[in-house]
Structures are given as structure tokens and as C-alpha cells.
């Protein structure tokens, strides 16, 4: 790997990617890792699938109790679905059809483990529910069948697949235009569950032309629960990275999302922000489309929302936008984002602090004016405190932010970081297990040492003022130790730093690593310990 800023490239900023410590592929991988980590957390504030569980009223309680008794007895081996129920479902009597569909729906609404497999393994039942979806003359039957199918689709991928294979998706999309709001809402819910299952299911729903009717519904609906469900379904249509949805098929939702960001409902705001975070997660063309929709100022305002479930996805969206080029990053800065990010660095939520550091790290990977804006916002003192005290995953992001600033900053800006005490916490990172972060810390220290060398030449003193600071922070000992690191890039960098900035006066060639031609790696001799042991 090339050094972060080799002597021949001191004043050269690579324009093809945000962080000139890394090549473009590495930077892309870093952003993907962020996404994976987020998915692993199974975000508590957003479920990809939702089961519709009714609130039982007293009138229905006795019937439900009897039904539940029957369900409990099924655990002893008896089937919860009787032959009579199936016969009634296939009856020509619409009243019997409705009553039986309600029975199935109630079973499928039971928590915590509804008998989904038993229902889908009963021949013809799912197909019958799909058939009932077409009964425009009987909206109550449509609603009950849609509810039952929604709860089946809330299950495993295999269970969701059964609903798709029965041909439900195109009919659900037609029902988005139903004259009955309950039917519309249940159709939205079902489609959200199906789209939330996998990228394959998401793309199938998109290819069935869901977007226009869904956006029409979002534009016209005045029912809050409907709008909430529709925005949640929309966020599932935008979600996913491997692969992402075809951008042309989801980008038409941007104007609607822009309007929804001014809702006063936290649930709705959260899902709108998640949708925007998904849409902005990718190449600069996607980021530009999000910027052009006019959402940036409102997203920055929502960083200060008092509900964590809104501030978190707003931060993710803002963070994704600043992974773009310097001009795109500047759009966010022009919305007064830095005071908000400074505020978030003191959040009680570690995940928010980490995301804020990650966002700032992409701003400090920008141009010198942008680094200066971070300085002027008084953010670096807090970052350096985080670098010393926070959880490791947050310290990592703070390290990126500081090293990026040393990479692209002016001499004055780098001196400012040194004056804040950035050297010791960077030295402390040299002993961590994460090789990438060791490299980040080494790169930051190298940038500082390079500046010191330039200053010593200019002053004629011949003394690099930063070598002593690194030695005082036990950094030299740690860099020497890294010469035996298993990672080739780390031990080569450590050797180069020692040789160039801390070279011994007698220039003992025996200290240089030998090269193992067969293994294509350096071999470092183990230094002999003095008889009385090492004195640290």
C-alpha cells in the first residue's frame, strides 16, 4: 500500500475518492462494513417485517379463548386446523367464507408463535386467500384475507415465498387503489413485509410496478397509520446493498420523501430518514440525486431531533452524503451541520457518537477549507478526548477523522492538532489488534513527522520537534515493536519511520531487515536483551 502522503505527493490531493489514505476499493469496503455492522444490530427502532396483531376486545374474547384452547391442544399432536374449517373456507357461502377467514386470521395473529407452517401446508388455503383478495364486491373478506396473508409473509423467507408464488403481489398492488382504506392499508402492510424479506423479493415487488400507486397513496392519504405503513414499505423497497435496488426504480420517491420529512410523527420521520439513508448509500450519482431533491437542510435539522430513532437515521443519511466529493460535502456544511455533529459527539448513545465520528472523518477527508471548518467548530478537542476514552469502535472513527486531517491539512492545521495533544492517543493505538487502525495511526504520525522534518530544515536546527513528543508518548518503543508485526505493510511502515526519522547515528546496516526471497517478506532479527532485562 502506498503511504498516506509520500514525500512526492505532499500537496497532491487525490480526487477520485474521499480518503487518500486508502485506494478507492478500500474506501468502498469501509463503507460496506459500516452497513453490515448496522444490519447486525437489527436496529431496535426499525423492523423489516411486522406482524399485524389485533387488540382483542371483550366481545371477541370468548371466541378467541376457545380458539386459543384449540391452538394449545394442537401442541399435543392434534391439528389446529380442522377439516371443517377447510370445508367452510371452500364453501360457496360468502358468510361462511368470511367467518372462516377470520378464524384463520386470528390464529395467524397469535403471539409469539403463530401456526404459519400448518396453515401454508394445508392444501389450497393460501391460494384461497389470494382468490378472496379479488372479491371487490366484499371488502371485508378482502381485508381479512389480506390480513391473514400479511401475517404469513411476516414469517420466514420460505413462508414469504409461498405468498409470492400464489400470485398475491400484483393483486396487493391493485388493492392500493381500493376504495376502502382498511383494504389499502392491509395491502401496503403485506407488500412491505414481502419487500422486507430479501433483495430478491424487493426487486420482484418493484418489478411489479408498485412505486407509482404507492406514491399516489402516500400523497393522498390522510390516515396516519396508512402513511406510516406506506413509508415503512417504501423504506424496505429502498433498502439493501447486495445488490441495491435499481436506482431508477426507486429514485422517483425522492420528492415524496422530501415532503414527508416535515411530518411531526416520529415513526414516519424515522422511516423516511432510513429510506433516504439507503438511497444516499452508494456512488456520487446517487448522492447527487438525493441532494437535488432538497432534503439536506431538513436532514441536518433532524440531527437534533429529541427522539433517537429519528436522529439516528438522519445522521446515517448525512454521513452517507459526505462520503461524496468535496462539493457534495460542502452542501451539508452549508446547512450548519458541524454544530449539530459536535452536539452528537456528546450523545448518551455510543452508536450515535460513533456515527458522528464517522461522518466527521469523511468531512476531514475533504479540502483544507473543510478541515478548517471542523477546526472552527471546535470539534477536534472533543475528538481527541474520544480518541483517549471511548469504546474502541468509536475511537477507531475518531482516529480516521484526525489522521485524515493530518493528511490533507495545512502545516498550521497539523500544528493545531499537535497542540491539542493528538500524538499520545495516536501512539496508544499502535498496540491494538485491529491492523487497519494501526496503519491509520502510523499514517497520522508519519504526516506529523514529515511536517516536523520540513520545519527543521526551514529553521536550520536539524531537530524534528515531533520526534521527542512521540518518544515521550512511548510511541518510538511501540513503532520499534511493530517491526515484528505479522502484517507486511505495518512492519515495512514501522521500519521506514524508524529509519527515516529516528535513525541511529552509526547507521548500523545490521539493523535493516533481511529479505526472504522464497517467502517474499522481510525477516527481522530479534534484538538481544541486556542481561538485566529491558528497562522501559
Swiss-Prot record:
Residues 316-404 are annotated as: NLS binding site (minor). InterPro entries: ARM-like, ARM-type_fold, Arm_3, Armadillo, Importin-a_IBB, Importin-a_IBB_sf, Importin_alpha. Residues 147-239 are annotated as: NLS binding site (major). The modification N-acetylmethionine is found at residue 1. A motif (Nuclear localization signal) lies at residues 45-54. GO terms for biological process: entry of viral genome into host nucleus through nuclear pore complex via importin; maternal process involved in female pregnancy; positive regulation of cytokine production involved in inflammatory response; positive regulation of transcription by RNA polymerase II; positive regulation of viral life cycle; protein import into nucleus; symbiont-mediated perturbation of host defenses; transcription by RNA polymerase II. One of its GO terms (cellular component) is host cell. Its main location: cytoplasm. ARM repeats lie at residues 76-115, 116-159, 160-204, 205-243, 244-288, 289-328, 329-370, 371-410, 411-453, 457-502. The modification Phosphoserine is found at residues 6, 113. It comes from the Eukaryota. GO terms for molecular function: nuclear import signal receptor activity. The keyword Transferase does not apply. Residues 1-29 are annotated as: Disordered. Only slightly detected in Ehrlich ascites tumor cells, thymus and skeletal muscle, clearly detected in kidney, spleen, liver, heart, and lung. High expression in testis. Residues 1-60 form the IBB domain. Keywords: Acetylation, Cytoplasm, Phosphoprotein, Protein transport, Repeat, Transport. It is found in: Cytoplasm. Pfam families: Arm, Arm_3, IBB. Consists of an N-terminal hydrophilic region, a hydrophobic central region composed of 10 repeats, and a short hydrophilic C-terminus. The N-terminal hydrophilic region contains the importin beta binding domain (IBB domain), which is sufficient for binding importin beta and essential for nuclear protein import. Forms a complex with importin subunit beta-1. Interacts with ZIC3. Belongs to the importin alpha family. PANTHER family: IMPORTIN ALPHA. Functions in nuclear protein import as an adapter protein for nuclear receptor KPNB1. Binds specifically and directly to substrates containing either a simple or bipartite NLS motif. Docking of the importin/substrate complex to the nuclear pore complex (NPC) is mediated by KPNB1 through binding to nucleoporin FxFG repeats and the complex is subsequently translocated through the pore by an energy requiring, Ran-dependent mechanism. This is Importin subunit alpha-7. The gene is Kpna6.
